[in-house]
A protein has these predicted regions:
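Catalytic cores of carbohydrate-active enzymes across secretory and cytosolic contexts
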Residues: 1-185
């Protein structure tokens, strides 16, 4: 799951197990968590969607029928322990994810600090938010014209080839850039 705004999908998955398979809510939630990874991208509070209870109730007031939970238990899925007046989509995602990660080591640390309230019994550095550093597949990411500038041929570019980037004559780099721009437009 990519960011908290996608967290409602976990409710649909849970509902299908509760209504379609006859599982009790907690068994369905555990199954969904065991098969869900949540990636948080935003290490600032403003980036985490939160909604007032009346708005959430308007769309999910039938939660007991839908997922087998009374309203107070349903609304608590969008909260850390202690609760607030708002339904937090990131907290909902974390209630249904067996693995949580940030998108870099630094972001993982920032997320541990920001989301620590979800795990009040843990020290901040024990908060189970891992870090996965995004990467690039150079062979498909690097345009053939840039590859030729870096390697002098059409062989697949390698990370070590970028050490030569500063040696590329500016007019040659500009020519390839403008050609790629023309192709894009």
């Amino acid at each position: 799951m990519n960011e908290g705004h996608a967290a409602f999908l976990t409710l649909e998955r849970t509902s299908r197990l509760v209504r379609g398979e006859g599982l009790p809510f907690e068994a369905a939630r555990e199954y969904v968590a065991a098969t869900t990874l949540f990636t948080t991208h935003t290490p600032v509070p403003a980036g985490h969607d939160r909604f007032a209870e009346d708005l959430v109730r308007r769309y999910f007031g039938d939660a007991e029928e839908w997922v087998g939970l009374p309203w107070d238990r349903f609304f608590a899925l969008g909260q850390a322990s202690g609760g607030t007046a708002e339904f937090n989509m990131t907290y909902l995602a974390m209630h249904f994810a067996g693995y949580v990660n940030g998108v870099s080591k630094l972001h993982g640390l920032a997320s541990q600090k920001l989301l620590h309230a979800f795990w009040p019994g843990l020290l901040e550095n024990e908060v189970p938010i891992a870090a996965v550093t995004n990467g690039v597949h150079l062979a498909t990411w690097t345009h053939p014209g840039v590859t030729r500038l870096l390697r002098g041929n059409d062989e697949t570019v390698r990370p070590a080839d970028f050490a030569n980037a500063a040696k590329i004559p500016a007019p040659d780099l500009w020519r390839v850039h403008q050609g790629n721009k023309a192709l894009l437009l």
